[in-house]
Amino acid sequence: MPEGYTHVRTAQRAAHAIHYKLQCPAAFAAGANGPDSFFCYEVWKKGQNRTYNLPLLGNRMHEDKTGAFLLALLHHTHTQAQIEYTLGFLCHYAADTVMHPYVVFVSSPGQPYGMKGGHGYFEIALDSTLHAEDTGVSEVPADDSSPVPVGQDLAEIAALLHQCILEVYGQDISVEALADSFYYTYRLRRLFTSRHGVRRAFYWVLELFFGGRGFITGHVSPAHLKLNLPEDWTDPATGEERHGGAFALLKDAQHRCELFMTAALGHWMGKLDEEILEKTLGSMSYITGTETEQSKSQQAPDAEQAGETA
């Protein structure tokens, strides 16, 4: 999964390409972070001690009933903030399904980021490189990677998520916790900048006792992208030989974002029927970029899942 700025940047470029003028940019950026926003919720606690285990839910949303959740968002969206959050979320899905197989490959043994924690080191280095290209500064501030919707916009997004998560995954998460997840993400990413290397050195020691190598430093900017990234690679999920490295894939990700947003807007305007919408979006695993039995599942949550809150 790319880091926050890569997701937001790709989504914004896609919106510009289809001539969609954002009215709620923070809502759109929050959507572009997708389920990743849940990973930071009460991150200092162990799973069983969190008010809700949103990091576990975030992992599940990347693999389980992915198409069903996207359709739920599309069906229950009503306000402008909800519309733009949903469009951003579609872009997160689009970018992950294009980029993530390459991330897995490039961080596998023998590849440039094959070291422990390499997955995160590659993603934050790509974030830093793109931010430097856009702004001249490789340090990625939280305002650029994960701005927080406020007021009524935040309330409407949290209500949308509550309804869709309950419907698709059977988990009754409070709107307060869902709203808090955006603040936790923002606050944590504010700590993950280290212009002069002091914080990075502290985190380098800290993560030896908390999470392991790369758990924290794999999210710290600025970071330098290695120059020997492969252009030819093997898809880890399918075994297919692929051509086109990180920057070619970013263009592909943007095009997929454009396709999915155009489909959503067409559906809301009554110009694209449900069957074509479903076929366009698919129901892919965010991890493999392919459809799996788990990602395609449309089954209602069982009783145990429906009662799960933490």
What are these regions (language model features)?
Residues 1-86, 93-310:
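N-terminal leader/auxiliary helical segments
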